[in-house]
Amino acid sequence: MSKTDKIPSHVAIIMDGNGRWARARGLERHEGHRAGVNSLRNVIARAARNPGVRYLTLYVFSTENWGRPQEEVDMLMELLCRSIVNELDELLREQVKVVVIGERAGMSKTVVEHIELIERETAACTELTILLCINYSSRGELTRAARRLAEKAVSGELSPAEITPETIAGELYTGGIPDPDL
């Protein structure tokens, strides 16, 4: 296999453009989001069956998405919960572990319960790990990591000189997971 044929071990996908896709076809935005879920089902199935792909990161809902119209946010959260319920058996069958990264503060109790359900039920799965970024921002993640390192420095657990790219990486949601290849 040549270097250009190397299968990535960690693929990341920004789920964007569903509303534009729907508008271009004369459909409602929510129909675009539902079509996006259907496309994602195929991506997950292919990744789960590819022994080279170990991690699939899906940027599902950023912190900026809270600025969308409330009706759309509610629909997206309902679609997320429904997708968790509808896809759980298939994820278990395919041995797909799901980990949600992002801040749970601000999410409804129902959404958090669904997130906890899918994480708990798939925790022992070993073929593929999906990282769902929900209520996520990279700035928020870096702020969280910096705060945790500062707390360790103040408590004497760590000296400022010991803060390295590796210690920062260890405080990220994705600590211990390779960076995305794509």
Please provide the spans of the model-predicted regions.
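Flexible, compositionally biased loop and terminal segments
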Residues: 1-182
